[in-house]
Amino acid sequence: MLIAGAGVTGISCAIALRERGVPFRIVNKGRRVGGRMASRIVRDSGTPFDGRVFDTGASYFTVSESEFASVVAKLETAGVVQPWTDTFHFADAEGIAGVKTGPMRYRAEGGIRSVVEYLAHDLVIEEGEITKLPTSERLALCMPTPQAARVFPPASDLSSAVWEPVISVSMLFDHAHWSDFDGIFVNQDAQITWIANDGARRGDQAPALVVHMSPVLSAGHLGDPSEVIPIAIARVQKILGFDEEPTWSHAHRWTFAKPIEGTTSPKPGFVL
């Protein structure tokens, strides 16, 4: 079995195959595992926070299935993940409007990528890109469907699934200019959808925020994600109520961040 992609899906697939004694190999386009469970190390920022990790992709994860709960329990025992919070704030375009309780969200002190790195620590992963389907192997395409269709043309029907882009903007400040919070869902705002207190999420209480831009705004700036940084700063200042500028910022583009609409009639053997 050939597994294309070393995000959490690809690594989980590999672990399941290994447990069943099925031979496999993993090929990953990037140098590091994780996919959209991504973290970035701050470098050359001119701040005291060089070496610090930001979560630039998935913000957290929740547990709803008992089988996954057993995996998370092992990760927690190993110190890889920690319970974070079950309460987030919500805001509108003018500011924070209230709080909402939901399922427990889990964080990873070493960055959410460290979860996948831990799971993959004893797997052999080849770096490279699959450009055509090997005829002698079964294939697991563990990637967004538009990318899968490029590798495997018979999966072109799956490329009809609609995916939203997101640009995430990471920011560092000289100190926290905001009251305590973990995360804020921003509703009915044309520019941003989410603000994470990365200092609370990481557990180091650093004056660090991560903002997710709206899909529509992100789609217009995929060619140069840095263009949205001033917009993100202005919205954060408005919602959190301060005027200070960040000492460092960085924008990351996710062209295929999440699916919002899938194909309804896949060919036999293809499942989203």
Enumerate the language-model features and the residues they cover.
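Beta1/beta-strand and adjacent pyrophosphate-binding region of the FAD-binding site
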Residues: 1-9
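N-terminal FAD cofactor-binding segment of flavoenzymes
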Residues: 16, 39-88
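Glycine-rich FAD pyrophosphate-binding loop
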Residues: 18-48
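Conserved flavin/dinucleotide-binding core of flavoenzymes
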Residues: 32, 56, 206-272
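Central helical "cap/lid" subdomain
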Residues: 34, 49-51, 137-185, 242-244
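Short beta-strand to alpha-helix junction loop
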Residues: 60-66, 89-118, 222-231
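A conserved short coil-to-beta-strand element within the FAD-binding core of flavoproteins
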Residues: 126-135
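Active-site substrate-recognition segment that forms the wall
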Residues: 171-221, 231-240
